[in-house]
């Protein structure tokens, strides 16, 4: 199978590319290698598979319409996984326009590429952040997500709406995956686990927001990628029982679906930090701070639909996942 993966030098994208290549797929990776965080780790991720005979890499921006049209026309993919986006809830507060270019304009170019080139299935990264002001736990795809708390969250909700439009108008199968706090080896340096590990090893204090009372449904990278692959292999069907008088937000008569991919087991931030301290054999100096603008206190994924449709549920414990991350970190940075 020939697959375009956008964000191929990113955390989730690079891990997915390796899995697809390992099983024999042909992969065209797209990434703009921006400097949102240190590009060196992107290059290091890419180096693990850049010379694979079934891999082609393209350094282009999703917002570049001509380049994206050429990528689709040249390679004619059967499936597409969009993992490229301007990430970060907090960054979106100070840099909103970056999210429009990548997450809205760029996604429109992907949808157009799929539409005009006979793509069989588009899978794209949404986010748990779309649940916004909702506090009904666990978060279900059958709940409305109409109150985002950041432009990042709004852009991800917009992706879901744009995808539905294309599924409805052009019969393009699309599936959105709401990822819940992904962590693990080769992670993003701007995320808490990476920052905490660096600070603790250097004897620096760590900033703990919401006084450590956050609960997050931390989900290990390999569990995320396994979910992506299972979904990718089964193009989204329409829901024949969908009722327009009582519309279900998670399905449609069109070939459009949404799924949560989370560990279904939220962990308090202080417990997450304790697991990291145990893995490092060091105690963190903590600076307790209030909840930041745009953040939500808790996330908790209801994965019943994922289990029902794909017989799959993430299961890696925080302790095991953090131990694997720390082992990778110490080796990668030669600490």
Predicted segments with their positions:
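C-terminal substrate-binding subdomain of Rossmann-fold SDR/epimerase-dehydratase oxidoreductases
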Residues: 19, 200-335
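N-terminal Rossmann-like NAD(P)+-binding domain of SDR-like oxidoreductases, especially those catalyzing
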Residues: 1-182, 312, 324, 328-332
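Conserved active-site region of classical short-chain dehydrogenase/reductase
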Residues: 66, 104-112, 190, 222-225, ...
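A glycine/serine/threonine-rich, flexible loop-to-helix segment
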Residues: 137-138, 189-197
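Hydrophobic alpha-helix immediately C-terminal to the catalytic Tyr-X-X-X-Lys motif of short-chain
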Residues: 158, 162, 166, 196, ...
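Non-catalytic, surface-exposed connector residues within folded enzymatic/regulatory domains
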Residues: 40, 93, 173-176, 190, ...
């Amino acid at each position: 199978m020939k697959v375009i993966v956008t964000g191929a030098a990113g955390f989730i994208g690079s891990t997915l590319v390796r899995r697809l290549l390992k099983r024999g797929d042909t992969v065209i990776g797209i990434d703009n290698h921006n400097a949102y965080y240190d590009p060196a780790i992107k290059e290091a991720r890419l180096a693990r598979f850049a010379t694979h005979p079934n891999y082609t890499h393209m350094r282009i921006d999703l917002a570049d319409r001509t380049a994206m049209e050429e990528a689709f026309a040249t390679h004619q993919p059967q499936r597409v996984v969009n993992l490229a986006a301007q990430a970060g809830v907090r960054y979106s507060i100070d840099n909103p326009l970056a999210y429009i270019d990548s997450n809205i304009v760029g996604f429109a170019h992907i949808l157009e590429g799929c539409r005009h080139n006979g793509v069989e299935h588009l899978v794209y990264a949404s986010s748990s952040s779309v649940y916004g002001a909702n506090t009904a736990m666990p978060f279900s795809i059958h709940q409305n997500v109409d109150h985002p708390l950041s432009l990042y969250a709004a852009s991800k909700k917009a992706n879901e709406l744009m995808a539905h439009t294309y599924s409805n108008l052009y019969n393009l199968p699309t599936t959105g995956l709401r990822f819940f706090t992904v962590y693990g080896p080769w992670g993003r340096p701007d995320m808490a686990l990476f920052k905490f590990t660096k600070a603790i090893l250097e004897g620096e204090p760590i900033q703990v927001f919401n006084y450590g009372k956050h609960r997050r449904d931390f989900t290990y990278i390999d569990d995320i990628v396994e979910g992506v692959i299972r979904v990718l292999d089964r193009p989204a069907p329409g829901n024949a029982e969908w009722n327009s008088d009582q519309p279900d937000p998670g399905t449609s008569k069109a070939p459009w679906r949404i799924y949560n991919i989370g560990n279904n087991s939220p962990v308090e931030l202080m417990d997450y930090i304790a697991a990291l301290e145990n893995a490092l054999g060091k105690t963190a100096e903590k600076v307790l701070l209030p909840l930041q603008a745009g953040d939500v206190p808790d996330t908790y994924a209801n994965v019943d639909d994922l289990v029902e449709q794909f017989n799959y549920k993430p299961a890696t414990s925080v302790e095991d996942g953090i131990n694997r991350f720390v082992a990778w970190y110490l080796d990668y940075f030669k600490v």
